[in-house]
Amino acid sequence: MAVPKKKSSKSKGRSRAAHHAIKAPNLTSCSNCQEPMMPHRVCPKCGWYDGREVVSMEE
Protein backbone atom coordinates (compact mmCIF):
# COMPACT_ATOMS: atom_id res chain seq x y z
CA MET A 1 0.00 0.00 0.00
CA ALA A 2 1.33 3.46 -0.91
CA VAL A 3 2.43 5.67 1.96
CA PRO A 4 3.48 9.34 1.69
CA LYS A 5 7.26 9.73 1.95
CA LYS A 6 7.06 13.32 3.25
CA LYS A 7 4.40 15.34 5.04
CA SER A 8 2.36 17.52 2.67
CA SER A 9 2.54 21.20 3.51
CA LYS A 10 -0.62 23.21 4.19
CA SER A 11 -0.09 25.27 1.05
CA LYS A 12 0.16 22.17 -1.17
CA GLY A 13 -2.97 20.61 0.31
CA ARG A 14 -4.97 23.82 0.23
CA SER A 15 -3.89 24.66 -3.31
CA ARG A 16 -4.97 21.19 -4.43
CA ALA A 17 -8.33 21.61 -2.67
CA ALA A 18 -8.92 25.01 -4.29
CA HIS A 19 -10.88 23.30 -7.08
CA HIS A 20 -13.37 21.75 -4.64
CA ALA A 21 -15.26 24.96 -3.87
CA ILE A 22 -19.06 24.90 -4.04
CA LYS A 23 -20.24 26.85 -7.07
CA ALA A 24 -23.30 29.09 -7.06
CA PRO A 25 -26.25 27.43 -8.82
CA ASN A 26 -27.20 28.58 -12.30
CA LEU A 27 -30.50 30.43 -12.33
CA THR A 28 -32.73 31.06 -15.31
CA SER A 29 -35.95 33.05 -15.47
CA CYS A 30 -39.32 31.35 -15.78
CA SER A 31 -40.84 31.85 -19.22
CA ASN A 32 -44.28 32.39 -17.67
CA CYS A 33 -43.72 34.60 -14.59
CA GLN A 34 -40.04 35.67 -15.01
CA GLU A 35 -39.14 34.49 -11.49
CA PRO A 36 -35.62 33.09 -11.03
CA MET A 37 -35.61 29.29 -11.02
CA MET A 38 -33.23 26.36 -11.43
CA PRO A 39 -32.99 25.10 -15.03
CA HIS A 40 -34.84 21.89 -16.03
CA ARG A 41 -37.18 22.11 -13.03
CA VAL A 42 -40.79 23.16 -12.47
CA CYS A 43 -41.11 26.82 -11.44
CA PRO A 44 -41.84 26.92 -7.69
CA LYS A 45 -43.90 30.13 -8.03
CA CYS A 46 -46.29 29.33 -10.90
CA GLY A 47 -45.89 25.57 -11.55
CA TRP A 48 -44.98 25.89 -15.24
CA TYR A 49 -42.35 23.85 -17.09
CA ASP A 50 -41.49 23.79 -20.81
CA GLY A 51 -44.25 26.24 -21.77
CA ARG A 52 -47.13 24.48 -20.04
CA GLU A 53 -48.65 24.23 -16.57
CA VAL A 54 -47.46 21.02 -14.91
CA VAL A 55 -48.48 21.68 -11.30
CA SER A 56 -51.61 23.67 -10.49
CA MET A 57 -50.83 26.34 -7.90
CA GLU A 58 -53.79 27.34 -5.73
CA GLU A 59 -53.80 31.05 -4.88
UniProtKB/Swiss-Prot annotation:
<dbReference type="GO" id="GO:0015934">
    <property type="term" value="C:large ribosomal subunit"/>
</dbReference>
<comment type="similarity">
    <text>Belongs to the bacterial ribosomal protein bL32 family.</text>
</comment>
<protein>
    <recommendedName>
        <fullName>Large ribosomal subunit protein bL32</fullName>
    </recommendedName>
</protein>
<dbReference type="GO" id="GO:0003735">
    <property type="term" value="F:structural constituent of ribosome"/>
</dbReference>
<dbReference type="Pfam" id="PF01783">
    <property type="entry name" value="Ribosomal_L32p"/>
</dbReference>
<dbReference type="GO" id="GO:0006412">
    <property type="term" value="P:translation"/>
</dbReference>
<dbReference type="InterPro" id="IPR044957">
    <property type="entry name" value="Ribosomal_bL32_bact"/>
</dbReference>
<keyword id="KW-0689">Ribosomal protein</keyword>
<dbReference type="InterPro" id="IPR002677">
    <property type="entry name" value="Ribosomal_bL32"/>
</dbReference>
<feature type="region of interest" description="Disordered">
    <location>
        <begin position="1"/>
        <end position="21"/>
    </location>
</feature>
<keyword id="KW-0687">Ribonucleoprotein</keyword>
<dbReference type="InterPro" id="IPR011332">
    <property type="entry name" value="Ribosomal_zn-bd"/>
</dbReference>
